[in-house]
Amino acid sequence: MRGFKADMTNTQPLKVALPNKGSLAESASQILKEAGYRQRNDVRDLAFIDPDNGVEFYYLRPRDIATYVGSGELAIGITGRDLLEDSNADAGEILGLDFGKSTFRFASIPGRSELSGSRIATAYPTLVRGFLESKKINATIVGLDGAVESAIRLGVADVIADVVSTGGTLKQAGLEVFGDPILTSEAILIERRGSIRDSKIDTLIRRINGVVIARQYVLVDYDVPKSSLEKACELTPGLESPTISPLQKPEWVAVRAMVKRNDVHAVMDQLWEVGARGILVTDIHSCRL
């Protein structure tokens, strides 16, 4: 990868870093597909060119992506917020992508919740060190590469600090989390701090943001009597305002609005109660807002 400094001119392809494997890899490629970018067909490919959009994708270890982007080797990348915070790379977060969510927590045997004077095993030493320093807690960090759940049982640590998604792995190891989360993580889009964005970067950010928003909303259409329109619009205010159209029946109107996906069934029930009929829900694949 030496020599592939991020070129910010439109004559050169935009170089983008993506996870090559792990929990983020498939979702990262999928969101780019939905944003109109071609992706590799073979998971063994380390690079792929999308000539239509002028983008080169490089598939790298998730932990290395912030380093490549922060050094200017690649212009932009997708990684985890936890990995960025632990990297010391000169890269910053652009946009949360609403997948790969987890928390970074301390855990130990049931009943133990003391950090001061403890040996803390973790694969994220920079992140943990920063937290301890911010809280003025004196503890010893035991750096491990990979799974740390066995560190307490094997006697090399008193506490572990690790990414927690469901907590199932910790329970199997006889551990439980304690204290507040050190960090709430998700997949994020990153760039080098202070870099100048060109039109290709702006387009990629805008497209991905459109997919992120579209996944969070649905489009709701319904007919409602004019006498109930105000109540119905209170339930479906949309992002700015709902679209209202006349119908052949003069006492009825048609309404269209974006509604939070997680709220849509409750909203449909409430619309029905105020007299709305013909309530339809449509997925949104992308948007520009």
Sequence positions of predicted segments:
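Small-molecule-sensing regulatory modules
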Residues: 3-4, 8-55, 59, 79-103, ...
